[in-house]
């Protein structure tokens, strides 16, 4: 009998991973461009802080997009309501922190966008694992600022996968 344990840094083969070099000031413009050109059913956008999730969700709503924030400051019932709206198609974009999105399983999620690069490689794997589930194809996009170049390399080494540049 042979028992193998999957590494915590394994990513699904169903997920196409891409990155985009972007300076901090131009992230919102880059996001707007992606939302214009990518065909998506539902998307999770990961931001590093609770405040950033709220701010980004408000900016997307101001552009007429069905977006909402989800973070650790929200009551559990409110988080569940927001996730329910995503499942039902009333929302198309969820802007989340890592903690708020742990274990999130919504079939509609076709895209995961890392607006802020995660602090560690394991978080990256957890984030992009919200798409490409149950045999479906998924898209993972990572924004990388010039000083985050090293983290991009660390993610590629940990996942043993080259992430293609957009």
Protein language model features and the residues they cover:
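Conserved helicase RecA-like core
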Residues: 1-166
């Amino acid at each position: 009998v042979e028992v193998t344990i999957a590494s915590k840094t394994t990513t699904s083969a169903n997920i196409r991973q891409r990155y985009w070099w972007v300076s901090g000031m131009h992230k919102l413009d880059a996001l707007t461009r992606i939302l214009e050109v990518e065909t998506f059913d539902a998307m999770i956008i990961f931001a590093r802080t609770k405040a950033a999730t709220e701010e980004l969700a408000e900016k997307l709503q101001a552009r007429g997009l069905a977006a909402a924030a989800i973070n650790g400051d929200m009551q559990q019932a409110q988080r569940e309501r927001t996730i329910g709206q995503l499942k039902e198609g009333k929302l198309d974009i969820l802007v989340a922190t890592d903690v708020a999105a742990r274990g999130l399983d919504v079939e509609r999620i076709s895209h995961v966008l890392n607006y802020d690069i995660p602090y560690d490689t394991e978080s990256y794997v957890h984030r992009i694992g919200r798409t490409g589930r149950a045999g479906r194809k998924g898209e993972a996009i990572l924004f990388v600022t010039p000083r985050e170049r090293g983290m991009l390399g660390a993610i590629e080494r940990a996942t043993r996968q080259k992430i293609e540049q957009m």
